Amino acid sequence: MLQTHQLNKLYRKSCVVENLNLRVEPGDIYGLLGQNGAGKTTTLRMLLGLVKPTSGQIEWYGHALTRPLYGRIGSIIETPGFYPQLTAAENLELHRRMSGIPEKGTVMEYLKLVGLEKAAHRKAKQLSLGMKQRLGIARAMMHRPDMLILDEPINGLDPLGIKETRELIVDLQRKREITVLISSHILGEIQLMASRIGIMHQGRLIEQLDYEDIQGKNRHYLELKIDDEKRTAVLLERELHLTNFQVCEQGMIRLYEGFQDSGAINRRLVEAGIEVKELTIQTDSLEDFFIRATTRKELA
Protein backbone atom coordinates (compact mmCIF):
# COMPACT_ATOMS: atom_id res chain seq x y z
CA MET A 1 0.00 0.00 0.00
CA LEU A 2 2.57 2.56 1.17
CA GLN A 3 6.25 1.87 0.67
CA THR A 4 9.52 3.79 0.74
CA HIS A 5 12.76 2.94 -1.04
CA GLN A 6 16.09 4.14 0.37
CA LEU A 7 14.49 7.30 1.77
CA ASN A 8 16.97 9.84 3.13
CA LYS A 9 16.71 13.26 4.72
CA LEU A 10 19.69 15.47 5.47
CA TYR A 11 19.61 18.81 7.28
CA ARG A 12 22.89 20.51 6.37
CA LYS A 13 25.34 17.69 7.05
CA SER A 14 23.21 15.84 9.60
CA CYS A 15 21.35 12.73 8.37
CA VAL A 16 18.08 12.46 10.34
CA VAL A 17 16.57 9.65 8.22
CA GLU A 18 18.86 7.17 6.49
CA ASN A 19 18.06 4.54 3.85
CA LEU A 20 14.50 4.03 5.10
CA ASN A 21 12.65 1.06 3.56
CA LEU A 22 9.21 1.19 5.16
CA ARG A 23 6.30 -1.01 4.07
CA VAL A 24 2.72 -0.59 5.28
CA GLU A 25 0.16 -3.15 4.08
CA PRO A 26 -3.61 -2.56 3.66
CA GLY A 27 -5.45 -3.06 6.95
CA ASP A 28 -2.36 -2.63 9.11
CA ILE A 29 -2.20 -0.74 12.33
CA TYR A 30 1.50 -0.05 11.90
CA GLY A 31 3.30 1.18 15.01
CA LEU A 32 6.42 3.21 14.19
CA LEU A 33 8.43 3.19 17.41
CA GLY A 34 11.48 5.13 18.48
CA GLN A 35 12.89 7.43 21.09
CA ASN A 36 12.52 11.18 20.72
CA GLY A 37 14.86 12.26 17.93
CA ALA A 38 14.85 8.87 16.19
CA GLY A 39 13.43 10.38 12.98
CA LYS A 40 9.77 9.34 13.28
CA THR A 41 8.17 12.75 12.77
CA THR A 42 10.50 13.64 9.89
CA THR A 43 9.56 10.33 8.25
CA LEU A 44 5.83 11.04 8.56
CA ARG A 45 6.31 14.57 7.24
CA MET A 46 8.07 13.17 4.17
CA LEU A 47 5.26 10.65 3.62
CA LEU A 48 2.74 13.51 3.70
CA GLY A 49 4.70 15.79 1.38
CA LEU A 50 5.37 18.33 4.14
CA VAL A 51 9.13 17.76 3.96
CA LYS A 52 10.99 16.99 0.74
CA PRO A 53 13.26 13.92 0.93
CA THR A 54 16.92 14.43 0.09
CA SER A 55 16.78 11.19 -1.90
CA GLY A 56 14.73 8.03 -2.25
CA GLN A 57 11.20 7.18 -3.36
CA ILE A 58 7.74 6.98 -1.80
CA GLU A 59 5.16 4.71 -3.48
CA TRP A 60 1.40 4.30 -3.09
CA TYR A 61 0.23 0.93 -4.44
CA GLY A 62 3.36 0.71 -6.59
CA HIS A 63 3.08 4.22 -8.06
CA ALA A 64 4.94 7.37 -7.09
CA LEU A 65 3.05 9.22 -4.35
CA THR A 66 2.03 12.47 -6.03
CA ARG A 67 -0.05 15.43 -4.88
CA PRO A 68 -3.45 14.09 -6.13
CA LEU A 69 -2.96 10.90 -4.10
CA TYR A 70 -2.56 12.76 -0.80
CA GLY A 71 -6.34 13.10 -0.74
CA ARG A 72 -6.49 9.40 0.13
CA ILE A 73 -4.55 10.01 3.35
CA GLY A 74 -5.80 11.67 6.54
CA SER A 75 -3.29 12.86 9.11
CA ILE A 76 -2.53 14.51 12.42
CA ILE A 77 1.02 15.77 12.87
CA GLU A 78 1.65 17.07 16.38
CA THR A 79 -1.26 18.47 18.44
CA PRO A 80 -4.35 19.28 16.31
CA GLY A 81 -5.27 22.98 16.36
CA PHE A 82 -8.79 24.43 16.39
CA TYR A 83 -10.43 27.85 16.57
CA PRO A 84 -11.00 28.12 20.35
CA GLN A 85 -14.15 30.27 20.13
CA LEU A 86 -15.87 27.93 17.68
CA THR A 87 -17.69 24.80 18.78
CA ALA A 88 -16.54 21.30 17.87
CA ALA A 89 -19.22 21.13 15.18
CA GLU A 90 -18.37 24.59 13.82
CA ASN A 91 -14.69 23.69 13.53
CA LEU A 92 -15.56 20.58 11.51
CA GLU A 93 -18.08 22.50 9.39
CA LEU A 94 -15.41 25.07 8.55
CA HIS A 95 -13.05 22.27 7.55
CA ARG A 96 -15.79 20.64 5.45
CA ARG A 97 -16.38 23.82 3.47
CA MET A 98 -12.69 24.64 3.00
CA SER A 99 -11.99 21.07 1.86
CA GLY A 100 -14.89 21.01 -0.59
CA ILE A 101 -16.62 18.07 1.08
CA PRO A 102 -20.20 18.21 -0.27
CA GLU A 103 -22.13 16.13 2.29
CA LYS A 104 -23.49 18.47 5.00
CA GLY A 105 -24.30 15.55 7.27
CA THR A 106 -20.62 14.62 7.46
CA VAL A 107 -20.00 16.78 10.54
CA MET A 108 -22.40 14.98 12.87
CA GLU A 109 -21.52 11.63 11.30
CA TYR A 110 -17.89 11.99 12.30
CA LEU A 111 -18.57 13.58 15.67
CA LYS A 112 -20.63 10.50 16.44
CA LEU A 113 -17.93 8.24 15.02
CA VAL A 114 -15.38 9.54 17.55
CA GLY A 115 -17.85 9.72 20.43
CA LEU A 116 -18.18 13.51 20.56
CA GLU A 117 -21.79 13.98 19.46
CA LYS A 118 -22.73 15.22 22.97
CA ALA A 119 -19.89 17.76 22.82
CA ALA A 120 -20.86 19.07 19.38
CA HIS A 121 -21.88 22.50 20.71
CA ARG A 122 -19.06 22.93 23.21
CA LYS A 123 -16.38 25.44 22.29
CA ALA A 124 -13.03 23.97 21.37
CA LYS A 125 -11.33 25.77 24.25
CA GLN A 126 -13.58 23.85 26.66
CA LEU A 127 -12.56 20.43 25.36
CA SER A 128 -10.00 18.26 27.13
CA LEU A 129 -6.79 17.31 25.35
CA GLY A 130 -8.15 13.81 24.76
CA MET A 131 -11.37 15.21 23.25
CA LYS A 132 -9.34 17.52 20.99
CA GLN A 133 -7.34 14.52 19.83
CA ARG A 134 -10.55 12.68 18.93
CA LEU A 135 -11.88 15.80 17.21
CA GLY A 136 -8.64 15.90 15.22
CA ILE A 137 -9.17 12.30 14.14
CA ALA A 138 -12.75 13.16 13.09
CA ARG A 139 -11.44 16.03 10.98
CA ALA A 140 -8.76 13.81 9.41
CA MET A 141 -11.43 11.23 8.52
CA MET A 142 -14.02 13.55 6.96
CA HIS A 143 -12.83 13.11 3.38
CA ARG A 144 -13.02 9.31 3.87
CA PRO A 145 -9.33 8.47 3.40
CA ASP A 146 -7.91 4.98 2.90
CA MET A 147 -5.12 5.63 5.37
CA LEU A 148 -4.66 7.59 8.58
CA ILE A 149 -1.22 8.85 9.67
CA LEU A 150 -1.00 9.87 13.34
CA ASP A 151 2.09 11.37 14.97
CA GLU A 152 2.25 10.67 18.72
CA PRO A 153 -1.57 10.82 19.16
CA ILE A 154 -1.49 9.72 22.82
CA ASN A 155 1.39 11.93 23.91
CA GLY A 156 0.40 14.09 26.89
CA LEU A 157 -2.99 12.46 27.42
CA ASP A 158 -4.22 11.28 30.81
CA PRO A 159 -4.92 7.54 31.27
CA LEU A 160 -8.58 7.90 30.26
CA GLY A 161 -7.67 9.92 27.17
CA ILE A 162 -5.07 7.33 26.18
CA LYS A 163 -7.59 4.50 26.56
CA GLU A 164 -10.28 6.33 24.57
CA THR A 165 -7.88 7.24 21.75
CA ARG A 166 -6.48 3.71 21.55
CA GLU A 167 -9.96 2.15 21.43
CA LEU A 168 -11.01 4.66 18.76
CA ILE A 169 -8.05 3.80 16.52
CA VAL A 170 -8.71 0.06 16.81
CA ASP A 171 -12.43 0.62 16.19
CA LEU A 172 -11.76 2.72 13.08
CA GLN A 173 -9.54 0.03 11.63
CA ARG A 174 -12.11 -2.70 12.25
CA LYS A 175 -15.29 -0.90 11.20
CA ARG A 176 -13.96 1.34 8.43
CA GLU A 177 -11.22 -1.04 7.27
CA ILE A 178 -8.81 1.88 7.30
CA THR A 179 -5.04 1.47 7.42
CA VAL A 180 -3.31 3.31 10.27
CA LEU A 181 0.32 4.39 10.58
CA ILE A 182 0.97 5.63 14.10
CA SER A 183 4.22 6.88 15.59
CA SER A 184 4.86 6.71 19.31
CA HIS A 185 7.46 6.26 22.02
CA ILE A 186 4.83 4.82 24.42
CA LEU A 187 5.49 1.16 23.76
CA GLY A 188 2.90 -0.31 26.12
CA GLU A 189 0.04 1.31 24.23
CA ILE A 190 1.33 0.35 20.78
CA GLN A 191 1.57 -3.22 22.06
CA LEU A 192 -2.20 -3.18 22.66
CA MET A 193 -3.19 -2.11 19.14
CA ALA A 194 -0.51 -2.63 16.48
CA SER A 195 -0.51 -5.53 14.03
CA ARG A 196 2.88 -4.56 12.61
CA ILE A 197 5.86 -2.85 14.19
CA GLY A 198 8.76 -0.78 12.88
CA ILE A 199 11.57 0.37 15.18
CA MET A 200 13.57 3.49 14.31
CA HIS A 201 16.88 4.23 15.98
CA GLN A 202 19.18 7.12 15.14
CA GLY A 203 17.41 7.71 11.83
CA ARG A 204 17.43 4.10 10.65
CA LEU A 205 14.67 1.49 10.53
CA ILE A 206 16.36 -1.37 12.41
CA GLU A 207 13.37 -3.74 12.76
CA GLN A 208 10.15 -4.22 10.78
CA LEU A 209 7.96 -7.24 11.43
CA ASP A 210 4.48 -8.45 12.32
CA TYR A 211 3.62 -8.28 15.99
CA GLU A 212 3.06 -12.05 15.97
CA ASP A 213 6.68 -12.47 14.88
CA ILE A 214 7.81 -10.30 17.78
CA GLN A 215 5.90 -12.53 20.16
CA GLY A 216 7.68 -15.53 18.63
CA LYS A 217 11.05 -13.87 19.19
CA ASN A 218 10.29 -12.79 22.73
CA ARG A 219 11.99 -14.80 25.42
CA HIS A 220 10.29 -16.69 28.22
CA TYR A 221 11.81 -16.40 31.66
CA LEU A 222 11.31 -17.20 35.32
CA GLU A 223 10.78 -14.07 37.38
CA LEU A 224 12.01 -14.46 40.95
CA LYS A 225 11.07 -12.00 43.66
CA ILE A 226 13.32 -12.71 46.61
CA ASP A 227 14.62 -11.00 49.74
CA ASP A 228 18.31 -11.21 48.75
CA GLU A 229 19.18 -10.95 45.06
CA LYS A 230 22.95 -11.14 45.68
CA ARG A 231 22.82 -14.48 47.52
CA THR A 232 20.32 -15.78 44.96
CA ALA A 233 22.63 -14.86 42.07
CA VAL A 234 25.56 -16.65 43.71
CA LEU A 235 23.47 -19.77 44.37
CA LEU A 236 22.11 -19.90 40.81
CA GLU A 237 25.58 -19.65 39.32
CA ARG A 238 27.67 -21.75 41.70
CA GLU A 239 25.27 -24.50 42.78
CA LEU A 240 22.70 -24.76 39.99
CA HIS A 241 25.14 -23.77 37.20
CA LEU A 242 22.65 -21.30 35.74
CA THR A 243 24.33 -18.21 34.30
CA ASN A 244 21.75 -16.75 31.91
CA PHE A 245 19.96 -14.46 34.33
CA GLN A 246 19.54 -10.76 34.93
CA VAL A 247 19.30 -8.86 38.21
CA CYS A 248 16.63 -6.33 37.21
CA GLU A 249 16.18 -4.40 40.43
CA GLN A 250 16.41 -4.87 44.14
CA GLY A 251 14.68 -8.12 45.04
CA MET A 252 14.07 -9.29 41.45
CA ILE A 253 15.91 -11.65 39.10
CA ARG A 254 14.92 -12.87 35.62
CA LEU A 255 16.17 -16.36 34.81
CA TYR A 256 16.30 -17.20 31.08
CA GLU A 257 17.35 -20.86 31.33
CA GLY A 258 16.40 -23.89 33.37
CA PHE A 259 13.09 -22.36 34.43
CA GLN A 260 11.22 -25.49 33.33
CA ASP A 261 12.42 -26.97 36.63
CA SER A 262 11.09 -24.05 38.67
CA GLY A 263 10.02 -26.32 41.53
CA ALA A 264 13.58 -27.55 42.13
CA ILE A 265 14.92 -23.99 41.90
CA ASN A 266 12.37 -22.78 44.43
CA ARG A 267 13.14 -25.69 46.77
CA ARG A 268 16.90 -25.04 46.70
CA LEU A 269 16.46 -21.33 47.38
CA VAL A 270 14.23 -22.05 50.37
CA GLU A 271 16.70 -24.64 51.69
CA ALA A 272 19.40 -21.97 51.52
CA GLY A 273 17.30 -19.66 53.68
CA ILE A 274 16.31 -17.30 50.87
CA GLU A 275 12.74 -16.05 51.08
CA VAL A 276 10.96 -16.55 47.75
CA LYS A 277 8.13 -14.02 47.66
CA GLU A 278 6.97 -14.78 44.13
CA LEU A 279 7.97 -17.12 41.31
CA THR A 280 6.25 -16.82 37.92
CA ILE A 281 6.86 -17.70 34.26
CA GLN A 282 6.77 -14.50 32.16
CA THR A 283 7.30 -13.41 28.55
CA ASP A 284 9.23 -10.38 27.31
CA SER A 285 7.15 -7.30 26.56
CA LEU A 286 7.42 -5.08 23.49
CA GLU A 287 9.53 -2.76 25.65
CA ASP A 288 12.01 -5.60 26.30
CA PHE A 289 12.17 -6.35 22.56
CA PHE A 290 12.70 -2.65 21.77
CA ILE A 291 15.53 -2.33 24.29
CA ARG A 292 17.25 -5.45 22.94
CA ALA A 293 16.95 -4.24 19.34
CA THR A 294 18.28 -0.73 19.98
CA THR A 295 21.04 -1.97 22.29
CA ARG A 296 22.23 -4.48 19.67
CA LYS A 297 22.38 -1.68 17.10
CA GLU A 298 24.46 0.54 19.37
CA LEU A 299 26.91 -2.29 20.09
CA ALA A 300 27.21 -3.29 16.42
Predicted features along the sequence, with ranges:
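Catalytic Walker B motif of ABC-type/P-loop ATPase nucleotide-binding domains
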Residues: 148-152
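ABC transporter nucleotide-binding domain
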Residues: 166-256
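Conserved ABC transporter NBD signature motif
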Residues: 49, 56-71
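Conserved ABC ATPase "signature" region
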Residues: 93, 102-119
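Short, charged/small-residue-rich alpha-helical element at the C-terminal edge
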Residues: 220-293, 300
